[in-house]
Each structure stands twice: as structure tokens, then as C-alpha cells.
Amino acid sequence: TKGDTFVITGDIHAMWLRDSTAQVMHYLRFADDEAVAELIEGLLARQAKNILIDPYANAYNREPSDYKPFDDRPRASDWVWERKYEIDSLCNPIHLAWAYFEKTGREGFLTEDFHRALKTVVDVFETEQNHADSPYRFQRSSCPPSDTLENDGMGAPVARTGMTWSGFRPSDDACRYGYLVPSNLFAMQELRHAAVFARRLGDEALARHAETLSAQIEEGVKQYGHVNHPKFGDILAYETDGMG
């Protein structure tokens, strides 16, 4: 419908925040066309709505449905198809918004829902800097170990590093160590873009919050995300728990 774009992924009639972004990025070159612009702004509106429904989910239904493809605990909202928390799920809508904004200069997507979604993303990333205090749990029965989180749904223990925790990778497989470095770098960048949008929306407090969080994540990667390889020297780790 006008102002609302729902993009299914493959043969699954659900929308992933990550996949829906990737599925329209190649249309940005045509975003000067009104119909394409409407499609992208409709998707940004739907992504913001989904984040406000549940920022820890990775995939959503078009409409509420009590059908669940998996036996997950705790049971997710009827709007949610799957509730695997992945950092990049929250980064991708901001990534799309920034690319669209840079290409067109349009700001019609900067709605109150988008504003609230930005604040939600920043709040979740900050919460997950100290995962021990997080409300998020995820357990799935009768599945491979990569489809569930150990430790009663909390995942393996992690130390505080300044980075933000992720339950799952972009592949939807569970993180072995809670700090997924590439996704933290993605978050670092998109928080800077979020700060720009926050200022466009007149929210200086949110802009500063996003910038502070971005700097903390960057410092965390510098301190805990590097490894000295005997052959290749200083390289970035893929994942770390910050525990040495």
C-alpha cells in the first residue's frame, strides 16, 4: 500500500531488516523516479515500524499471525517471524536511509516513527554493551547448536569492552563469542549516520548519544578486536568475548 513497502525474502513470506535493505539498494540509482522513491520510503517506514514492534527480532510478518515456524522461547510477538538478535538487523535500515538521503537529498522518511526507531536502536546497542543486564533471551528446541543460544538463552559469557553484543551473525547462526567485530564496525558507522538524522530531526541529545556510543564501540574494537598474527601482523578478529 502507499507509504508501506513489505519486501519478502526469497520463498519465505517474511521480511528481514537486512535482506529487505539489500534487495532494494540497487534501485537507488533510479530513486529520482517518484515511484521508486515511494517504494524506498515505504520500506523505510515499514522497517521503522518493525523496529518499534521488537528491536531484537530479525524477521517480521506482514500482518500479525499466531503461526510460528519454530518452537522458540520466549514466544515472540505475532508480528515477528523470527527473533534472532543480530546487530546488522538494526544497522541496515539506517544504512539504506543514509544511501537514499545521499542520493536524493529527500527527507520525507524522517518521520516520528523513524525518529523513535533511531532512539530505540541507540538504546538497544547501549544496553548490549553490558549483556549481563539485557532482557534478551533466545532458546530453540530440536535444532542444531547454531540455531540457539547456550547458557539458558543468554549466550556465552562476555566481558564489558565498549563493543555491543550480538546473539547471531548475519548468516542467522549463533555467535560463538558475543562481540562480532565486523558488525560492531557497521554499528559504529551507522551510529554516526544516525546522529546526522537526529540533528535533522532537532534531537541534539540523541545525536550526542549516538556519537558517544559510536566512539565507545570504536575504542572497544581497537582494544579488544585486534590480534597479532605471526605471519600477517595486526589483523581484526572476527569475534571476541573480551575475556582474553
Each PLM stretch: what is its role?
Residues 19, 89-96, 183-186, 190-194, ...:
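Amphipathic, well-ordered alpha-helical segments in soluble domains
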Residues 2-12, 60-84, 135-176, 228-244:
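Carbohydrate-binding/catalytic loop surfaces
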Residues 43-46, 213:
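Short acidic/histidine-centered micro-motifs embedded in hydrophobic/aromatic stretches
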Residues 13-40, 47-147:
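Aromatic-rich carbohydrate-recognition surfaces in CAZymes
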Residues 54-58, 126-143, 177-179, 189-244:
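Catalytic cores of carbohydrate-active enzymes
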Residues 2-3, 34-35, 202-208:
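Short, glycine- and charge-enriched coil/turn segments that flank and shape catalytic ligand pockets
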Residues 106-108, 114-166, 170-188, 192, ...:
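Helix-rich catalytic cores of soluble enzyme domains
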